[in-house]
Amino acid sequence: MEEGASERSKLIVNEAQNANKGGWITVPFIIGSMLGQGLALTGAMGNLVVYLIKEYNFKAVDAAQIGNIVQGCTSLAPLAGAVVSDAFFGCYPVVVFSAIVSFVSLILFTLTAAFRSLQPPPCASISDACVPSAGQLAFLYTAVGLMVVGSGGTQFNMLTFGAYQFDSVGDRDVFFNWSIVVMYAVSIIGSTSIVFVEDSISWALGFGVSAAANAIAVVLVLLGSKHYRRPAACGSPFTGLARVAVAAIRKWDVVVAEDDSKYAHGTSEFEESINLRPSQRFSFLNRAAWICHGDTRPDGSIAKPWSLCTVQQVEDFKSLLRIFPLWSASILLSVSIGIQLILTVLQALTMDRSLGPRFSIPAGSMVVSSLVSTVVSLLLLDRLILPLWQKLSPHPPRPLRRIGLGHIINTAGIAASALVERKRASIVRSHQPESQHGDWVVPMTELWLVLPLAVTGVADALHFPGQVALYFQAFPRSLKSTATGMMALIIALGFYLSAAMVDMSRRVTGWLQDDINGSKVENVYWLVAGLTLVNFGYYVLCAKLYE
Protein backbone atom coordinates (compact mmCIF):
# COMPACT_ATOMS: atom_id res chain seq x y z
CA MET A 1 0.00 0.00 0.00
CA GLU A 2 2.80 2.39 0.91
CA GLU A 3 4.58 1.64 -2.36
CA GLY A 4 1.39 2.28 -4.35
CA ALA A 5 0.68 5.52 -2.45
CA SER A 6 4.20 6.71 -3.14
CA GLU A 7 3.85 6.03 -6.86
CA ARG A 8 0.47 7.82 -6.97
CA SER A 9 1.91 10.86 -5.18
CA LYS A 10 4.75 11.02 -7.71
CA LEU A 11 2.22 10.93 -10.53
CA ILE A 12 0.16 13.75 -8.96
CA VAL A 13 3.24 15.97 -8.59
CA ASN A 14 4.34 15.15 -12.13
CA GLU A 15 0.90 15.95 -13.57
CA ALA A 16 0.85 19.31 -11.76
CA GLN A 17 4.23 20.23 -13.20
CA ASN A 18 3.13 19.25 -16.73
CA ALA A 19 -0.33 20.86 -16.66
CA ASN A 20 0.58 23.87 -18.82
CA LYS A 21 3.03 22.10 -21.11
CA GLY A 22 2.81 19.85 -24.14
CA GLY A 23 0.50 20.20 -27.13
CA TRP A 24 1.19 20.85 -30.80
CA ILE A 25 3.96 23.34 -30.06
CA THR A 26 6.19 20.36 -29.22
CA VAL A 27 5.55 18.49 -32.47
CA PRO A 28 8.07 20.34 -34.72
CA PHE A 29 10.83 19.61 -32.24
CA ILE A 30 9.89 15.95 -31.78
CA ILE A 31 9.12 15.17 -35.43
CA GLY A 32 12.20 17.08 -36.57
CA SER A 33 14.36 15.14 -34.15
CA MET A 34 12.83 11.85 -35.35
CA LEU A 35 13.62 12.86 -38.93
CA GLY A 36 17.26 13.59 -38.12
CA GLN A 37 17.70 10.45 -36.04
CA GLY A 38 16.08 8.28 -38.70
CA LEU A 39 18.33 9.65 -41.44
CA ALA A 40 21.38 9.12 -39.25
CA LEU A 41 20.50 5.51 -38.44
CA THR A 42 19.55 4.59 -42.01
CA GLY A 43 22.64 6.28 -43.43
CA ALA A 44 24.95 4.34 -41.13
CA MET A 45 23.23 0.95 -40.96
CA GLY A 46 21.49 0.73 -44.34
CA ASN A 47 24.72 0.23 -46.29
CA LEU A 48 26.79 -1.53 -43.62
CA VAL A 49 27.11 -4.83 -45.51
CA VAL A 50 28.49 -3.10 -48.59
CA TYR A 51 30.86 -1.04 -46.40
CA LEU A 52 32.26 -4.18 -44.79
CA ILE A 53 32.78 -5.86 -48.16
CA LYS A 54 34.29 -2.93 -50.05
CA GLU A 55 36.30 -1.13 -47.37
CA TYR A 56 37.11 -3.85 -44.81
CA ASN A 57 37.53 -6.77 -47.25
CA PHE A 58 34.96 -8.97 -45.51
CA LYS A 59 33.74 -12.03 -47.35
CA ALA A 60 30.23 -11.54 -48.67
CA VAL A 61 28.54 -14.16 -46.46
CA ASP A 62 30.43 -13.00 -43.35
CA ALA A 63 29.37 -9.42 -44.00
CA ALA A 64 25.78 -10.57 -44.52
CA GLN A 65 25.79 -12.36 -41.16
CA ILE A 66 27.24 -9.36 -39.34
CA GLY A 67 24.69 -7.12 -41.03
CA ASN A 68 21.83 -9.30 -39.84
CA ILE A 69 23.18 -9.44 -36.28
CA VAL A 70 23.57 -5.66 -36.16
CA GLN A 71 20.07 -5.18 -37.58
CA GLY A 72 18.78 -7.53 -34.91
CA CYS A 73 20.52 -5.51 -32.20
CA THR A 74 19.16 -2.19 -33.48
CA SER A 75 15.68 -3.75 -33.59
CA LEU A 76 15.90 -5.22 -30.09
CA ALA A 77 17.52 -2.20 -28.45
CA PRO A 78 14.35 -0.01 -28.52
CA LEU A 79 12.54 -2.54 -26.34
CA ALA A 80 15.35 -2.37 -23.79
CA GLY A 81 15.30 1.42 -24.04
CA ALA A 82 11.57 1.50 -23.36
CA VAL A 83 11.97 -0.66 -20.25
CA VAL A 84 14.79 1.56 -18.95
CA SER A 85 12.65 4.66 -19.53
CA ASP A 86 9.58 3.23 -17.80
CA ALA A 87 11.42 1.76 -14.86
CA PHE A 88 14.24 4.20 -14.10
CA PHE A 89 14.71 7.53 -15.88
CA GLY A 90 11.66 8.52 -17.92
CA CYS A 91 11.55 9.16 -21.68
CA TYR A 92 13.19 12.56 -22.05
CA PRO A 93 16.57 11.87 -20.38
CA VAL A 94 16.90 8.59 -22.28
CA VAL A 95 16.04 10.26 -25.61
CA VAL A 96 18.63 13.03 -25.13
CA PHE A 97 21.35 10.65 -23.93
CA SER A 98 20.74 8.21 -26.78
CA ALA A 99 20.76 10.96 -29.42
CA ILE A 100 24.15 12.16 -28.17
CA VAL A 101 25.50 8.59 -28.18
CA SER A 102 24.33 8.18 -31.80
CA PHE A 103 26.16 11.37 -32.75
CA VAL A 104 29.40 10.10 -31.20
CA SER A 105 28.92 6.83 -33.10
CA LEU A 106 28.61 8.64 -36.43
CA ILE A 107 31.73 10.68 -35.73
CA LEU A 108 33.58 7.38 -35.29
CA PHE A 109 32.07 6.01 -38.53
CA THR A 110 33.22 9.13 -40.36
CA LEU A 111 36.74 8.70 -38.99
CA THR A 112 36.87 5.07 -40.18
CA ALA A 113 36.08 6.25 -43.70
CA ALA A 114 38.28 9.36 -43.67
CA PHE A 115 41.53 7.84 -42.40
CA ARG A 116 43.04 4.90 -44.31
CA SER A 117 44.97 3.86 -41.20
CA LEU A 118 41.64 2.74 -39.71
CA GLN A 119 40.99 0.41 -42.68
CA PRO A 120 42.91 -2.53 -44.15
CA PRO A 121 44.70 -1.92 -47.46
CA PRO A 122 42.61 -2.55 -50.59
CA CYS A 123 43.45 -5.67 -52.58
CA ALA A 124 42.00 -7.71 -55.42
CA SER A 125 41.91 -11.00 -53.50
CA ILE A 126 41.67 -11.74 -49.80
CA SER A 127 45.06 -12.30 -48.17
CA ASP A 128 46.57 -11.83 -44.73
CA ALA A 129 47.68 -8.32 -45.70
CA CYS A 130 44.09 -7.40 -46.57
CA VAL A 131 42.52 -8.62 -43.33
CA PRO A 132 41.64 -5.78 -40.91
CA SER A 133 43.72 -5.66 -37.74
CA ALA A 134 42.30 -6.11 -34.25
CA GLY A 135 42.60 -2.39 -33.60
CA GLN A 136 40.78 -1.49 -36.81
CA LEU A 137 37.96 -3.91 -36.01
CA ALA A 138 37.75 -2.64 -32.42
CA PHE A 139 37.32 0.94 -33.66
CA LEU A 140 34.66 -0.12 -36.18
CA TYR A 141 32.75 -2.31 -33.73
CA THR A 142 32.80 0.49 -31.14
CA ALA A 143 31.06 2.74 -33.66
CA VAL A 144 28.51 0.02 -34.41
CA GLY A 145 27.89 -0.68 -30.71
CA LEU A 146 27.32 2.99 -29.90
CA MET A 147 24.87 3.24 -32.79
CA VAL A 148 22.91 0.30 -31.39
CA VAL A 149 22.77 1.99 -27.96
CA GLY A 150 21.67 5.24 -29.56
CA SER A 151 18.90 3.61 -31.56
CA GLY A 152 17.63 1.88 -28.44
CA GLY A 153 16.76 5.10 -26.68
CA THR A 154 15.27 7.07 -29.55
CA GLN A 155 13.05 5.00 -31.86
CA PHE A 156 10.09 3.88 -29.75
CA ASN A 157 10.84 6.32 -26.94
CA MET A 158 10.23 9.25 -29.28
CA LEU A 159 6.78 7.87 -30.10
CA THR A 160 5.92 7.43 -26.43
CA PHE A 161 7.35 10.83 -25.55
CA GLY A 162 5.39 12.51 -28.34
CA ALA A 163 2.11 10.83 -27.41
CA TYR A 164 2.52 12.03 -23.82
CA GLN A 165 2.27 15.64 -25.05
CA PHE A 166 -1.45 15.24 -25.87
CA ASP A 167 -4.57 14.65 -23.80
CA SER A 168 -6.89 13.99 -26.75
CA VAL A 169 -6.92 10.53 -28.31
CA GLY A 170 -7.59 12.14 -31.69
CA ASP A 171 -4.51 14.34 -31.39
CA ARG A 172 -2.43 11.32 -30.45
CA ASP A 173 -3.69 9.43 -33.51
CA VAL A 174 -2.72 12.32 -35.78
CA PHE A 175 0.72 12.40 -34.16
CA PHE A 176 1.16 8.66 -34.68
CA ASN A 177 0.13 8.96 -38.34
CA TRP A 178 2.69 11.70 -38.97
CA SER A 179 5.32 9.74 -37.08
CA ILE A 180 4.79 6.68 -39.29
CA VAL A 181 5.00 8.85 -42.42
CA VAL A 182 8.30 10.30 -41.13
CA MET A 183 9.68 6.83 -40.35
CA TYR A 184 9.00 5.55 -43.86
CA ALA A 185 10.15 8.81 -45.46
CA VAL A 186 13.52 8.78 -43.71
CA SER A 187 13.98 5.11 -44.55
CA ILE A 188 13.43 5.86 -48.23
CA ILE A 189 15.58 9.02 -48.23
CA GLY A 190 18.37 7.39 -46.26
CA SER A 191 18.35 4.24 -48.38
CA THR A 192 18.61 6.26 -51.59
CA SER A 193 20.31 9.64 -51.21
CA ILE A 194 22.75 8.91 -48.38
CA VAL A 195 23.54 5.42 -49.68
CA PHE A 196 24.12 6.94 -53.14
CA VAL A 197 26.58 9.45 -51.65
CA GLU A 198 28.41 6.63 -49.86
CA ASP A 199 28.60 4.42 -52.96
CA SER A 200 29.25 7.02 -55.65
CA ILE A 201 31.02 9.95 -53.98
CA SER A 202 32.60 9.20 -50.62
CA TRP A 203 31.93 7.02 -47.60
CA ALA A 204 33.29 9.77 -45.35
CA LEU A 205 30.88 12.31 -46.87
CA GLY A 206 27.94 9.93 -46.48
CA PHE A 207 28.70 9.28 -42.83
CA GLY A 208 29.35 13.00 -42.35
CA VAL A 209 25.89 13.84 -43.70
CA SER A 210 24.41 11.30 -41.28
CA ALA A 211 26.36 12.87 -38.40
CA ALA A 212 25.09 16.33 -39.38
CA ALA A 213 21.50 15.04 -39.43
CA ASN A 214 22.04 13.52 -35.99
CA ALA A 215 23.49 16.79 -34.65
CA ILE A 216 20.40 18.66 -35.87
CA ALA A 217 18.22 16.06 -34.13
CA VAL A 218 20.04 16.66 -30.83
CA VAL A 219 19.69 20.44 -31.15
CA LEU A 220 15.97 20.22 -31.99
CA VAL A 221 15.07 17.96 -29.09
CA LEU A 222 16.96 20.27 -26.69
CA LEU A 223 15.40 23.46 -28.10
CA GLY A 224 11.93 22.22 -27.23
CA SER A 225 12.81 21.21 -23.68
CA LYS A 226 10.90 24.05 -21.97
CA HIS A 227 7.68 23.04 -23.74
CA TYR A 228 7.70 19.31 -23.03
CA ARG A 229 5.69 17.29 -20.62
CA ARG A 230 8.15 14.86 -19.12
CA PRO A 231 6.63 11.54 -18.03
CA ALA A 232 8.19 10.28 -14.83
CA ALA A 233 9.45 6.73 -14.40
CA CYS A 234 6.82 4.72 -12.54
CA GLY A 235 8.41 1.29 -12.39
CA SER A 236 8.26 -1.56 -14.84
CA PRO A 237 4.95 -3.47 -15.20
CA PHE A 238 6.99 -6.60 -15.90
CA THR A 239 7.74 -6.87 -12.19
CA GLY A 240 4.10 -7.66 -11.47
CA LEU A 241 4.08 -10.33 -14.17
CA ALA A 242 7.21 -11.94 -12.75
CA ARG A 243 5.57 -12.01 -9.32
CA VAL A 244 2.68 -14.05 -10.75
CA ALA A 245 5.01 -16.77 -12.01
CA VAL A 246 6.99 -16.87 -8.75
CA ALA A 247 3.87 -16.90 -6.57
CA ALA A 248 2.24 -19.67 -8.63
CA ILE A 249 5.38 -21.82 -8.31
CA ARG A 250 5.62 -21.21 -4.57
CA LYS A 251 1.99 -22.26 -4.12
CA TRP A 252 2.08 -25.25 -6.47
CA ASP A 253 0.61 -27.51 -3.76
CA VAL A 254 -2.12 -25.11 -2.58
CA VAL A 255 -5.68 -26.36 -3.11
CA VAL A 256 -7.86 -23.54 -4.48
CA ALA A 257 -11.57 -23.51 -3.59
CA GLU A 258 -14.50 -21.66 -5.18
CA ASP A 259 -14.61 -18.97 -2.47
CA ASP A 260 -14.03 -15.66 -4.27
CA SER A 261 -13.42 -13.87 -0.98
CA LYS A 262 -10.13 -15.73 -0.62
CA TYR A 263 -8.70 -14.08 -3.74
CA ALA A 264 -6.65 -10.89 -3.48
CA HIS A 265 -8.10 -7.97 -5.41
CA GLY A 266 -6.37 -4.94 -3.94
CA THR A 267 -7.05 -1.55 -5.48
CA SER A 268 -6.89 -0.71 -9.13
CA GLU A 269 -7.32 2.28 -11.38
CA PHE A 270 -9.75 0.08 -13.35
CA GLU A 271 -12.95 -0.16 -11.36
CA GLU A 272 -14.11 -3.47 -12.80
CA SER A 273 -10.93 -5.22 -11.66
CA ILE A 274 -11.83 -4.80 -7.98
CA ASN A 275 -14.44 -7.57 -8.20
CA LEU A 276 -12.83 -9.47 -11.07
CA ARG A 277 -13.32 -13.24 -10.96
CA PRO A 278 -10.35 -15.40 -12.00
CA SER A 279 -10.96 -17.16 -15.32
CA GLN A 280 -10.61 -20.92 -15.76
CA ARG A 281 -8.13 -20.59 -18.62
CA PHE A 282 -4.66 -21.44 -17.24
CA SER A 283 -6.38 -22.05 -13.91
CA PHE A 284 -3.15 -23.31 -12.33
CA LEU A 285 -2.08 -19.65 -12.10
CA ASN A 286 -5.10 -18.72 -9.96
CA ARG A 287 -3.31 -19.95 -6.84
CA ALA A 288 -0.96 -16.94 -7.18
CA ALA A 289 -3.91 -14.75 -6.10
CA TRP A 290 -5.12 -17.16 -3.38
CA ILE A 291 -4.66 -15.67 0.08
CA CYS A 292 -2.73 -17.90 2.48
CA HIS A 293 -1.77 -17.27 6.08
CA GLY A 294 0.74 -14.45 6.39
CA ASP A 295 0.23 -13.13 2.83
CA THR A 296 -1.62 -9.99 3.98
CA ARG A 297 -1.31 -7.38 6.71
CA PRO A 298 -4.08 -6.64 9.24
CA ASP A 299 -5.33 -3.78 7.04
CA GLY A 300 -5.72 -6.18 4.10
CA SER A 301 -2.73 -4.94 2.08
CA ILE A 302 -0.32 -7.43 0.52
CA ALA A 303 2.56 -8.26 2.85
CA LYS A 304 4.42 -10.68 0.56
CA PRO A 305 4.27 -9.39 -3.05
CA TRP A 306 6.33 -12.35 -4.32
CA SER A 307 3.90 -14.81 -2.74
CA LEU A 308 0.57 -13.10 -3.38
CA CYS A 309 -0.65 -11.20 -6.44
CA THR A 310 -3.97 -9.61 -7.33
CA VAL A 311 -6.48 -11.30 -9.62
CA GLN A 312 -5.86 -8.50 -12.13
CA GLN A 313 -2.14 -9.30 -12.25
CA VAL A 314 -2.92 -12.98 -12.76
CA GLU A 315 -5.35 -12.24 -15.60
CA ASP A 316 -2.82 -9.91 -17.21
CA PHE A 317 -0.27 -12.72 -17.15
CA LYS A 318 -2.81 -15.11 -18.69
CA SER A 319 -3.53 -12.70 -21.54
CA LEU A 320 0.17 -12.72 -22.43
CA LEU A 321 0.29 -16.51 -22.38
CA ARG A 322 -2.75 -16.61 -24.64
CA ILE A 323 -1.23 -14.30 -27.26
CA PHE A 324 2.24 -15.86 -27.15
CA PRO A 325 1.62 -18.65 -29.76
CA LEU A 326 0.34 -16.10 -32.29
CA TRP A 327 3.31 -13.87 -31.56
CA SER A 328 5.72 -16.77 -32.08
CA ALA A 329 4.16 -17.51 -35.49
CA SER A 330 5.44 -14.13 -36.68
CA ILE A 331 9.09 -14.85 -35.90
CA LEU A 332 9.72 -16.98 -39.00
CA LEU A 333 7.93 -14.32 -41.04
CA SER A 334 10.55 -11.84 -39.87
CA VAL A 335 13.34 -14.36 -40.56
CA SER A 336 12.23 -14.68 -44.18
CA ILE A 337 12.25 -10.90 -44.61
CA GLY A 338 15.76 -10.63 -43.18
CA ILE A 339 17.11 -13.36 -45.46
CA GLN A 340 15.45 -11.89 -48.54
CA LEU A 341 16.84 -8.41 -47.87
CA ILE A 342 20.41 -9.53 -47.23
CA LEU A 343 20.57 -11.97 -50.16
CA THR A 344 19.06 -9.33 -52.43
CA VAL A 345 21.96 -6.99 -51.63
CA LEU A 346 24.46 -9.75 -52.46
CA GLN A 347 22.65 -10.49 -55.73
CA ALA A 348 22.52 -6.81 -56.66
CA LEU A 349 26.28 -6.44 -56.18
CA THR A 350 26.83 -8.89 -59.06
CA MET A 351 24.19 -7.49 -61.44
CA ASP A 352 24.00 -4.58 -63.86
CA ARG A 353 23.09 -1.63 -61.64
CA SER A 354 23.24 1.07 -64.30
CA LEU A 355 20.14 3.15 -64.93
CA GLY A 356 21.04 5.10 -68.02
CA PRO A 357 24.55 6.12 -69.08
CA ARG A 358 25.43 8.13 -65.95
CA PHE A 359 23.47 6.74 -63.03
CA SER A 360 23.98 3.53 -61.06
CA ILE A 361 21.60 2.21 -58.41
CA PRO A 362 23.45 1.36 -55.17
CA ALA A 363 22.93 -2.24 -54.08
CA GLY A 364 22.00 -1.10 -50.58
CA SER A 365 19.12 0.97 -52.00
CA MET A 366 17.18 -2.07 -53.20
CA VAL A 367 15.30 -2.15 -49.89
CA VAL A 368 13.50 1.01 -51.05
CA SER A 369 11.41 -1.17 -53.38
CA SER A 370 9.88 -2.89 -50.38
CA LEU A 371 9.41 0.38 -48.46
CA VAL A 372 7.67 2.12 -51.35
CA SER A 373 5.45 -0.90 -51.92
CA THR A 374 4.48 -0.90 -48.25
CA VAL A 375 3.65 2.82 -48.26
CA VAL A 376 1.55 2.55 -51.44
CA SER A 377 -0.25 -0.52 -50.10
CA LEU A 378 -1.00 1.21 -46.79
CA LEU A 379 -2.43 4.22 -48.64
CA LEU A 380 -4.62 1.96 -50.79
CA LEU A 381 -5.80 0.07 -47.73
CA ASP A 382 -6.55 3.23 -45.76
CA ARG A 383 -8.13 5.30 -48.54
CA LEU A 384 -9.76 2.73 -50.83
CA ILE A 385 -10.03 -0.85 -49.61
CA LEU A 386 -11.06 -0.28 -45.97
CA PRO A 387 -13.70 2.39 -46.80
CA LEU A 388 -15.13 0.05 -49.44
CA TRP A 389 -15.12 -2.79 -46.91
CA GLN A 390 -17.03 -0.62 -44.41
CA LYS A 391 -19.71 0.04 -47.01
CA LEU A 392 -20.13 -3.65 -47.78
CA SER A 393 -19.82 -5.00 -44.24
CA PRO A 394 -20.68 -3.51 -40.82
CA HIS A 395 -17.72 -5.32 -39.26
CA PRO A 396 -14.14 -4.15 -39.89
CA PRO A 397 -11.66 -6.81 -41.07
CA ARG A 398 -10.21 -8.67 -38.13
CA PRO A 399 -6.47 -8.39 -37.48
CA LEU A 400 -6.12 -12.18 -37.58
CA ARG A 401 -7.32 -12.35 -41.19
CA ARG A 402 -5.13 -9.43 -42.19
CA ILE A 403 -2.08 -11.12 -40.67
CA GLY A 404 -2.94 -14.44 -42.32
CA LEU A 405 -3.18 -12.82 -45.76
CA GLY A 406 0.18 -11.19 -45.10
CA HIS A 407 1.67 -14.64 -44.39
CA ILE A 408 0.47 -15.98 -47.76
CA ILE A 409 1.69 -12.99 -49.80
CA ASN A 410 5.05 -13.06 -48.01
CA THR A 411 5.55 -16.68 -49.11
CA ALA A 412 4.73 -15.61 -52.68
CA GLY A 413 7.38 -12.88 -52.44
CA ILE A 414 10.07 -15.34 -51.32
CA ALA A 415 9.10 -17.72 -54.13
CA ALA A 416 9.40 -14.82 -56.59
CA SER A 417 12.93 -14.17 -55.30
CA ALA A 418 13.77 -17.82 -56.00
CA LEU A 419 12.52 -17.52 -59.58
CA VAL A 420 14.53 -14.34 -60.19
CA GLU A 421 17.64 -16.03 -58.79
CA ARG A 422 17.04 -19.00 -61.10
CA LYS A 423 17.16 -16.64 -64.08
CA ARG A 424 20.27 -14.85 -62.75
CA ALA A 425 22.07 -18.15 -62.12
CA SER A 426 21.20 -19.44 -65.60
CA ILE A 427 22.79 -16.33 -67.14
CA VAL A 428 25.91 -16.87 -65.01
CA ARG A 429 26.16 -20.49 -66.18
CA SER A 430 25.71 -19.48 -69.83
CA HIS A 431 28.97 -17.50 -69.75
CA GLN A 432 32.33 -19.20 -69.78
CA PRO A 433 34.12 -19.22 -66.38
CA GLU A 434 37.23 -17.64 -67.90
CA SER A 435 35.20 -14.56 -68.86
CA GLN A 436 34.09 -14.07 -65.26
CA HIS A 437 36.94 -11.97 -63.87
CA GLY A 438 36.85 -10.32 -60.44
CA ASP A 439 34.77 -7.30 -61.53
CA TRP A 440 32.56 -9.24 -63.95
CA VAL A 441 28.95 -8.01 -63.99
CA VAL A 442 26.10 -10.40 -64.72
CA PRO A 443 24.38 -9.01 -67.85
CA MET A 444 21.02 -8.76 -66.11
CA THR A 445 19.52 -5.57 -64.70
CA GLU A 446 19.03 -5.49 -60.95
CA LEU A 447 15.52 -4.12 -61.55
CA TRP A 448 14.48 -7.80 -61.71
CA LEU A 449 14.90 -7.76 -57.92
CA VAL A 450 12.23 -5.07 -57.52
CA LEU A 451 9.24 -7.37 -58.13
CA PRO A 452 9.90 -9.84 -55.27
CA LEU A 453 10.61 -6.98 -52.87
CA ALA A 454 7.42 -5.21 -53.96
CA VAL A 455 5.38 -8.35 -53.26
CA THR A 456 6.95 -8.64 -49.82
CA GLY A 457 6.17 -4.95 -49.24
CA VAL A 458 2.47 -5.66 -49.83
CA ALA A 459 2.69 -8.45 -47.26
CA ASP A 460 4.34 -6.08 -44.77
CA ALA A 461 1.47 -3.61 -45.18
CA LEU A 462 -0.92 -6.36 -44.13
CA HIS A 463 0.76 -8.29 -41.34
CA PHE A 464 2.76 -5.57 -39.55
CA PRO A 465 -0.18 -3.21 -38.83
CA GLY A 466 -2.35 -6.26 -38.19
CA GLN A 467 0.04 -7.48 -35.53
CA VAL A 468 0.24 -4.07 -33.86
CA ALA A 469 -3.58 -3.89 -33.73
CA LEU A 470 -3.83 -7.44 -32.40
CA TYR A 471 -1.26 -6.94 -29.65
CA PHE A 472 -2.80 -3.62 -28.63
CA GLN A 473 -6.20 -5.32 -28.28
CA ALA A 474 -4.90 -8.43 -26.53
CA PHE A 475 -2.31 -7.02 -24.12
CA PRO A 476 -3.40 -6.03 -20.61
CA ARG A 477 -4.10 -2.36 -19.98
CA SER A 478 -0.97 -1.98 -17.90
CA LEU A 479 1.11 -3.04 -20.91
CA LYS A 480 -0.57 -1.16 -23.77
CA SER A 481 2.55 0.92 -24.43
CA THR A 482 4.65 -2.24 -24.53
CA ALA A 483 2.34 -3.95 -27.03
CA THR A 484 3.75 -2.12 -30.05
CA GLY A 485 7.27 -2.75 -28.76
CA MET A 486 6.74 -6.47 -29.30
CA MET A 487 7.22 -5.82 -33.01
CA ALA A 488 10.77 -4.70 -32.25
CA LEU A 489 11.42 -8.02 -30.54
CA ILE A 490 10.01 -9.96 -33.51
CA ILE A 491 12.18 -8.01 -35.96
CA ALA A 492 15.26 -8.51 -33.78
CA LEU A 493 14.73 -12.26 -33.50
CA GLY A 494 14.14 -12.40 -37.24
CA PHE A 495 17.51 -10.83 -38.00
CA TYR A 496 19.36 -12.97 -35.44
CA LEU A 497 17.82 -16.19 -36.72
CA SER A 498 18.30 -15.21 -40.36
CA ALA A 499 22.02 -14.79 -39.62
CA ALA A 500 22.03 -18.27 -38.06
CA MET A 501 20.18 -19.70 -41.07
CA VAL A 502 22.66 -18.13 -43.49
CA ASP A 503 25.49 -19.69 -41.50
CA MET A 504 23.74 -23.08 -41.52
CA SER A 505 23.24 -22.87 -45.29
CA ARG A 506 26.95 -22.23 -45.71
CA ARG A 507 28.27 -24.85 -43.27
CA VAL A 508 25.77 -27.70 -43.64
CA THR A 509 24.47 -27.53 -47.20
CA GLY A 510 27.22 -25.60 -48.98
CA TRP A 511 24.57 -23.58 -50.82
CA LEU A 512 26.18 -20.25 -49.91
CA GLN A 513 29.81 -19.58 -50.77
CA ASP A 514 32.02 -16.51 -50.73
CA ASP A 515 31.44 -16.21 -54.48
CA ILE A 516 27.71 -15.61 -54.84
CA ASN A 517 27.87 -16.65 -58.52
CA GLY A 518 29.06 -20.10 -57.47
CA SER A 519 26.38 -20.45 -54.80
CA LYS A 520 22.94 -22.02 -54.91
CA VAL A 521 20.98 -19.06 -53.60
CA GLU A 522 17.82 -20.36 -55.27
CA ASN A 523 17.81 -23.36 -52.93
CA VAL A 524 17.98 -21.08 -49.90
CA TYR A 525 14.98 -19.12 -51.15
CA TRP A 526 12.96 -22.29 -51.80
CA LEU A 527 13.83 -23.60 -48.33
CA VAL A 528 12.64 -20.35 -46.74
CA ALA A 529 9.46 -20.37 -48.86
CA GLY A 530 8.70 -23.93 -47.73
CA LEU A 531 9.29 -23.04 -44.09
CA THR A 532 7.03 -19.99 -44.29
CA LEU A 533 4.30 -22.13 -45.85
CA VAL A 534 4.53 -24.61 -42.96
CA ASN A 535 4.61 -21.67 -40.56
CA PHE A 536 1.36 -20.40 -42.08
CA GLY A 537 -0.27 -23.70 -41.12
CA TYR A 538 1.05 -23.19 -37.58
CA TYR A 539 -0.39 -19.66 -37.58
CA VAL A 540 -3.83 -20.91 -38.67
CA LEU A 541 -3.79 -23.45 -35.82
CA CYS A 542 -2.80 -20.77 -33.29
CA ALA A 543 -5.50 -18.43 -34.59
CA LYS A 544 -8.14 -21.16 -34.21
CA LEU A 545 -7.06 -21.82 -30.63
CA TYR A 546 -6.96 -18.10 -29.85
CA GLU A 547 -10.51 -17.55 -31.06
Task: Locate predicted features.
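Hydrophobic transmembrane alpha-helices of multi-pass solute transporters/permeases
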Residues: 2-121, 130-547
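Beta-strand-rich luminal/extracellular ectodomains of secretory-pathway glycoproteins
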Residues: 126-127
